């Protein structure tokens, strides 16, 4: 099957690696009843500022936030809680490292969720060249120019705005 961390990326409509932002993904968990080696602690991994995906940590969000901040992430680093990724009752809760616990509490999420942390969740970055339709690689030619892509996105925005206006009437 597909791991829930991949399903979470789809739910977030996010790429876990982006040029100039993060080229690594750390998949880990908080220490709980089963410890983790100190060299693999959340605090240790946080020093890298890579995208981090955490399993089995939803019940420890206060401690998780503290470990992430002490390790090097700022309180306002983008984060997300993805409850039951890929399930019909999936919920995506966007927040920051500093508001993880409050966000989960307000949504009544106590387990069965992944935590994703990193600047890749900001959403304002250039997409990966691998998926950029204006980028030619050894295996494919660019499918459009940057100008054409800009026009396409502008048209899509106009269509979405018109659709939303039609639904609100």
Identify the meaning behind each predicted range.
Residues 1-31:
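Short glycine-cluster motifs
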